[in-house]
């Protein structure tokens, strides 16, 4: 929690004003932020200086791991995060690759589970990683990448958190996650939860102990209309201790994740928080 607040302070003190063409708003920006999460100690990085939500983040992650390409499937899991991008993005609505209502195209999990090969067929990156790690194998290339520039035109959105690199040292599994851009007041809580949960889940189904997860953000920013609430409200609050994340121990394989797992299989305990803050969202 303290590293989150330290990043917010750094952006305010050191950030450079950048005009964002997509949103038409200015944002204070810093380049390169490194966060780490102690998954072994189960210090779940849920923001405590405002009421924050975690279920949608894990539900979205589960949809990625299943390779979903339809917003309706994400809604069934409990994540509404793809509704607007799938159905309200004018460029995507007019894209000939869009298959209809709720279609997201070849984004995120599709790339992770079915990366198209130039000579035909697909690569299931996640399956390869799980198979290797389950055998105790780390080939120094246990990488799950959603970033495929050759197919950006076939999806509604480029990935922000785009690459996850797993590493095995003895019986302890580590994760390095890479993110190109982050709206820190709104988006980082979501991203932190996903990085932490991804390492927890993969360690559990491959039979390893989780170590630390390392989260690199390239472009970390706060929008101009978010600054007053960040400076005058959130940064003046004292953080509470981190809560804990529990995952159903019966989840033991990728097939379990693909078939029967729901949000009822995850629980957060010990979550103390301040009141919610309604930060402006930039579309």
Curated annotation (Swiss-Prot):
GO molecular function term, any single one: thymidylate synthase activity
Sites where the protein binds dUMP: 22, 180-183, 191, 221-223
InterPro entries assigned: Thymidate_synth/dCMP_Mease, Thymidate_synth/dCMP_Mease_dom, Thymidate_synth/dCMP_Mease_sf, Thymidylate_synthase
Localization, UniProt: Cytoplasm
Keywords recorded for this protein, A-Z: Cytoplasm, Methyltransferase, Nucleotide biosynthesis, Transferase
BP term (GO), one: methylation
Enzyme class: transferase
Gene Ontology CC annotation, any one: cytosol
UniProt binding sites for (6R)-5,10-methylene-5,6,7,8-tetrahydrofolate: 183, 282
Active-site residues, Swiss-Prot/TrEMBL: 160 (nucleophile)
Pathway: Pyrimidine metabolism; dTTP biosynthesis
Gene3D superfamilies for the chain: Thymidylate synthase/dCMP hydroxymethylase domain (3.30.572.10)
Catalytic reactions of this protein: dUMP + (6R)-5,10-methylene-5,6,7,8-tetrahydrofolate = 7,8-dihydrofolate + dTMP
UniProt xrefs under HAMAP family: Thymidy_synth_bact (MF_00008)
Record's function text: Catalyzes the reductive methylation of 2'-deoxyuridine-5'-monophosphate (dUMP) to 2'-deoxythymidine-5'-monophosphate (dTMP) while utilizing 5,10-methylenetetrahydrofolate (mTHF) as the methyl donor and reductant in the reaction, yielding dihydrofolate (DHF) as a by-product. This enzymatic reaction provides an intracellular de novo source of dTMP, an essential precursor for DNA biosynthesis.
Complexes and interactors: Homodimer.
Descriptive protein name: Thymidylate synthase
Annotated source species: Shewanella loihica (strain ATCC BAA-1088 / PV-4)
Upper classification of the organism: Bacteria, Pseudomonadati, Pseudomonadota, Gammaproteobacteria, Alteromonadales
Gene: thyA
């Amino acid at each position: 929690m303290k590293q989150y607040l330290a990043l917010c302070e750094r952006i305010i003190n050191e950030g450079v004003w950048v005009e964002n063409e997509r949103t038409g708003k200015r944002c204070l920006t810093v380049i390169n932020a490194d966060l780490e999460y102690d998954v072994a100690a189960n210090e779940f990085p849920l923001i405590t200086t405002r009421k924050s939500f975690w279920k949608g983040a894990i539900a979205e992650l589960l949809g990625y791991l299943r390779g979903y390409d339809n917003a309706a499937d994400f809604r069934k899991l409990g994540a509404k995060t793809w509704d607007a991008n799938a159905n309200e993005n004018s460029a995507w609505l007019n894209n000939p690759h869009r298959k209809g209502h709720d279609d997201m195209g070849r984004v995120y999990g599709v790339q992770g589970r079915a990366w198209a090969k130039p000579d035909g067929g697909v690569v299931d990156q996640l399956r390869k990683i799980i198979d290797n790690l389950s055998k105790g194998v780390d080939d120094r290339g246990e990488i799950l990448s959603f970033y495929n520039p050759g197919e950006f035109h076939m999806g509604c959105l480029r990935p922000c958190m785009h690459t996850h690199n797993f590493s095995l040292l003895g019986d302890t599994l580590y994760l390095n996650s890479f993110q190109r851009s982050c709206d820190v007041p709104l988006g980082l809580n979501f991203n932190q939860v996903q990085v932490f949960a991804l390492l927890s889940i993969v360690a559990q189904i491959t039979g390893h102990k989780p170590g630390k997860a390392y989260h690199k953000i390239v472009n970390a920013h706060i929008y101009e209309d978010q600054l007053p609430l960040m400076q005058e409200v959130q940064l003046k609050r004292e953080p509470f201790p981190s809560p804990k994340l529990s995952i159903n121990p019966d989840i033991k394989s990728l097939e379990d994740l693909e078939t029967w797992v729901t949000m009822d299989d995850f629980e957060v305990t010990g979550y103390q928080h301040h009141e919610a803050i309604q930060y402006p969202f930039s579309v």
